[in-house]
């Protein structure tokens, strides 16, 4: 499984993000950190992170936005499944194990989960009440994206 993280000027938060990915209960991960032309010290930090864990690869590109960074990750990913995490996010320790197991157990091509948005002032949850992932094939997922009815984290 490949986890793709687009990164732009995120030296203040990307370490927490990557630590949460590397601490997953599912350990057969490839983590692709895509530096999207950062102008701060992000790239140096990403290279230090990669030097400590062989599962991490750093790719660089000129700034082109999150979609082009994700596409570069997809072009270089080795996994059979792909997950996307933003550089300012952290993930639950079993997130990818739960999502991947759900896909494999049901033959689904896509699994989405909710998310919690937290700040010092508030917390917002967009998770299903039973905590299970949403499962669908690619056509259902694309229709949901087009109509705006699908949101959350996915593999």
Where does each model-flagged region fall?
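Nucleotide-sugar donor-binding/catalytic module of glycosyltransferases
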Residues: 1-155
């Amino acid at each position: 499984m490949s986890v793709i993280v687009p990164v732009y000027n995120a030296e203040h938060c990307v370490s927490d993000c990557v630590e949460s990915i590397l601490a997953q209960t599912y350990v057969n991960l490839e983590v692709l950190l895509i530096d999207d032309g950062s102008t701060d010290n992000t790239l140096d930090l990403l290279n230090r992170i990669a030097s400590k864990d062989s599962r991490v690869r750093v790719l660089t590109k000129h700034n082109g936005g999150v979609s082009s960074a994700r596409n570069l990750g997809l072009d270089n990913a080795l996994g059979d499944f792909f997950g996307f995490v933003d550089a300012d996010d952290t993930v639950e320790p079993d997130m990818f194990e739960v999502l991947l197991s759900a896909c494999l157990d049901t033959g689904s091509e896509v699994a989405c989960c909710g998310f919690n948005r937290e700040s010092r002032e508030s917390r917002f949850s967009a998770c299903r009440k039973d905590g299970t992932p949403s499962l669908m094939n690619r056509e259902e997922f694309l229709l949901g994206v087009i109509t705006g009815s699908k949101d959350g984290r996915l593999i």
